[in-house]
Amino acid sequence: MKVAILTQPLHTNYGGTLQAFALQYVIKSLGHEPETINYRKQLPNTSLIRKILSRIKQKIISGRIIYSFDHDEMKIISKYHDEFINKYIKYSDVVYDVGALKSKIISGGFHSIVVGSDQTWRPRYSPRIDSFFLDFLQGDESIKKISYASSFGTDVWEFDQIQTNKFKLLLKQFHFVSVREKSAVKLCMDKFDVQAEHVLDPTLLLEKDIYMNLLSAKPTEHKKNGIFNYVLDKSLEKKDIIKKCAKILQMPVFSSYPLSTHKESCTIEDFNDYIYPPIEEWISSFYYADYVITDSFHGTVFSIIFNKPFISVANEYRGKARFISLLELFGLEDRLVSNSNDINSTLLFSPINFEEVNLRLVELRKNSIHLLQMSLLN
């Protein structure tokens, strides 16, 4: 059976791309034909005057101007991600509006549509949030509607009352609802009166060997040891955390991320500062690391998959609930820190019982795959 997958646009987000890869991998292993729909927001055609006014405002507020990458620049910056997507993920032609999205689903011969995973139910991250509750298929019973590991990204309700009422009606038309966070189970019941199952992020459904096969298919020279720093928000507080950890652990720090993710001049002189390293290199960083510091949900996930000692830095803006829910599954709540005052030698040298973690993962993985399988069959 053909299965459409509706997730957030794939571009340079390591975790986002790998969860899309993993979900397709599992659905394919269950005997279906998955295709991820390349649904994204049409970039506005902003006038020159508006661009200038916006940059003046940025300069006044933040003291610097951030320029947007144009289409050709993005192709260069994301070339390794695009290479991975083209090789491993069946991705449709780009769809910009809800009419084209509906036409793609209806004419594509899909038996089911799966919304997820990642923060598909978070307004600030998803293009036209109504689409991720499948409003364009309202009343259509010919296509099975499923959510797998969808996430609100936070335990704070971000929908207004009109949206809440609308999405409540839409979600009741889903044949199966599952979410990635424990807090989301409660939100679905309290706000939508819908019973949701708590399941694993797709990346945790795959055994480590599958990721190792990706590395074998594209060997990398990136074989650094020490502390893998995968911290997305470069605040002073987080820099202090990294320095303190390096000092206590007596380890060098390495990264696998562009030197710059913001364009602060009209033209780019050296693209090497902006290019996102290959996904295989990012995965290998976990494999070779002796320790991991991250403020990323998927950074935490891959630390667990590769059995690496780690600390996760709480990210209030990106959504702390995601980390709490994930770590509670494995009894690792003590690995979550908020600031440099939480860092000490007792925490950093405290061993993680990965034997127990791995046993829990096997059971959770088995249950999540079973629920996904049943949702596609029933």
Where are these regions (language model features)?
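Active-site anion-handling motifs in enzyme catalytic cores
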Residues: 1-378
